[in-house]
Amino acid sequence: MASPKLHDFRHIVVKVGSSLLIDSAAGEVRAGWLAALAADIAELHRGGRDVMVVSSGSIALGRSRLKLPRGPLKLEESQAAAAVGQIELARTWSEVLGAHGIGAGQILVTFQDTEERRRYLNARSTIAKLLEWRAVPVINENDTVATTEIRYGDNDRLAARVATMASADLLILLSDIDGLYTAPPGSNPDATLIPVVEAITAEIEGMAGAAGSELSRGGMRTKIEAAKIATSAGTHMLIASGKIDHPLKAIADGGKCTWFLTPANPVTARKRWIAGTLEPKGTLTIDAGAVSALRAGKSLLPAGVIRVDGQFSRGDAVIVRGPDTHEIGRGLVAYDAEDAEKIKGHSSPDVMMILGITGRAEMIHRDDLVVGTAPT
């Protein structure tokens, strides 16, 4: 199968590791390289694409600023170093993107933010709003509060979760190697690059090494794990070298890389997950006008809801039924059951007056809604 082209994609997540971003000897950001990457991002941005960045580097920058000795850090030392480094990292990205007239928004996430549905929806909504405002979200694991037991441990898998959360159609992992090889290229002269992976088989997994460095916790094995997460959610992924200047331009020009392809797309994969995987926690019964609106691709507004049943929290899956009780679809609800009961039948502008807060305009956003027959 032929490799796709970078400009075929509209919603792109770019992951940048510590070993690329930070000069390990000097403990400083590789300013020239980052400026070149920012220029690449700006070019995609000018083309109307949504670009999100998952950036490592907070711990590495923090330990440099604090003049900590080389070697492994204890958990509390890593957390404290990250607290210092996160400020430096945010400032750095703001400056390099600002040079192109692009705003940067920092988002610090934890493992729970992508696994617990209420927090998942909050993070997803924040990313969506930044993209709507044509800013570039810069995302990192919140190493200041993450624990050894509950964390991603590497930003490859975090990037895959972010790509899934944001319904990205492409995840780019910039690495110190230009793709997946049949064997470790540093020690095997017969190793060859695999340009396209259509399915992640046991053989493909066996090709993944465990290489890493003091600054970068990830190796090829974690990249394969990231590819599993991304492709199962309908997101294509590629691994390419970030050691060169203008790495995204190199990809666009057909440079060496490995593509991990998926036959699905993010929207269908996400809606399949909502319709067939999540257990519904309640039911919303809607009027005939709302039924017509949903079938026309609209979101479900509070005004169209006539009955609320069940005990559910924001982010839970619920069944949507028409006035004849037939199932219309399923979706992730933006309000818990108590608040949904209060605002049912009311127009969206009334929500603030009723709840005392500025809530979502939609009871279920169309991106979180599957309209059709009940799954079998």
Curated annotation (Swiss-Prot):
Signal peptide span: none
Catalytic activity as recorded in UniProt: L-glutamate + ATP = L-glutamyl 5-phosphate + ADP
Positions contributing to ATP binding: 15, 175-176
Domain of life of the organism encoding this protein: Bacteria
Protein keywords: Amino-acid biosynthesis, ATP-binding, Cytoplasm, Kinase, Nucleotide-binding, Proline biosynthesis, Transferase
Record bears the keyword Amino-acid biosynthesis: yes
PROSITE patterns given in the database record: GLUTAMATE_5_KINASE, PUA
CDD domains reported in the protein's UniProt record: AAK_G5K_ProB, PUA_G5K
GO cellular component terms listed in the entry, alphabetical order: cytosol
TM helices/strands, residue ranges: none
Residue positions binding substrate: 56, 143, 155
Subcellular location: Cytoplasm
E.C. code: 2.7.2.11
GO biological process: L-proline biosynthetic process
Metabolic or biological pathway, per its Swiss-Prot or TrEMBL entry: Amino-acid biosynthesis; L-proline biosynthesis; L-glutamate 5-semialdehyde from L-glutamate: step 1/2
GO molecular function, a single term: glutamate 5-kinase activity
Residues annotated as domain PUA: 281-358
SMART domains linked to this entry: PUA
Membership in a protein family: Belongs to the glutamate 5-kinase family.
Function: Catalyzes the transfer of a phosphate group to glutamate to form L-glutamate 5-phosphate.
Protein known as: Glutamate 5-kinase
Species whose genome carries this gene: Rhodopseudomonas palustris (strain ATCC BAA-98 / CGA009)
